[in-house]
Amino acid sequence: MNERDYRLDFCRGLALILIFIDHVPGNPLSLWTLRKWAFCDAAEVFVLISGISSYLAYGSKLDKLGFGGCCTAVARRLTRIYGAHLLLFLSAALFVRLASAYFVRVDYVDFLQVKHLFADPRHYVPAALTLSYLPKYLDILPLYLILLATAPAIIFLVKRDPWLALIVSALVYTMVRMTGFNLSAGHDGLGWNFNPFAWQFLYTIGVVVGHFSKVGFKADSLHYRYQWAWLTLAGGFAIFALLAAAPWSGTEESRALFSLYLWPAEKTFLSPLRVANVVALLYLFAFFVPKQAKFFSSRAASLFLACGRNSLPVYGVGVVLSCAGYVALSENDATNMTSVAVNVIGILSLFTLAYVLDWRRKNLRIVEASTPSNYAIALVRRFVG
């Protein structure tokens, strides 16, 4: 029986669509994404899910191949992600350069923060290659590169003592928040928008969740004994975050009061509010939605599942499309028609890309599993049955 947890692919796919929407400045649809209704946004969902997925993907490799074999498997994945980052960097930079040359309303090169690259390529090209130059919107993959590079060590520790792994991660997180230590983004005196030394805490939480999803909890564990208490706590915090952050008309005064002490929950050093909120939301989702719920077999869900299974190309294309969407909105005065077109075309493009990649992967598997004599039969069975 296939025991794949479709919730992971669905949440990752949904997060990628939300990231595209949020990355288009002035996009009216972003008023309805997670970042407007909670302390966290799609980035936290993506990192937490990535931690869970990393354990599920490499935990068994650590057992079978040892630490060295696990590192080798991770290194292969890192190579692909690094290549994708460089391709995305080049594509986005060239796109905004062409847009700035053709249009005059907005300096799109300055918007993406790549003006330094074109002004001094001899310095900034090597900086980009070493991840010491990170323009706007091009910082999630470098974060993921660093987090994934630490995955073998984190998984190794989690398998021996998950609580010790969390304590060590929390100590690093606390020290970074106290000292303000960060890596340089290489321009304008800025640091990384996603400080990896802070965001590793959320990633480690994901790895620990992945561990317990495989080994389970003891019947008398705190998880089962106080399950309804955890559910109440998660639900209560999610409601509190909604009331504090939601942009409802007439709640401006209450939001202003909350903002004095809580909001906006800063992102670079990963505010504890963001951690608590995303963990609460995913706990509620996991509690109420079975991992193979019938909903996941629907056509609508299948589109998000496909995006989740093809997260790297979907994210990269989504960033370029968000730049194109910003150009379209800026050059057409952000009319309602333009806003609808930007979102519909962008989201449908990502769904189509994910669907085509899924279709290609499935048919490659048919070819690999079939001899030339029975390939046609296998293909017919797949589409008929």
Predicted segments — roles?
Residues 1-385:
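Alpha-helical transmembrane segments and their immediate juxtamembrane cytosolic regions
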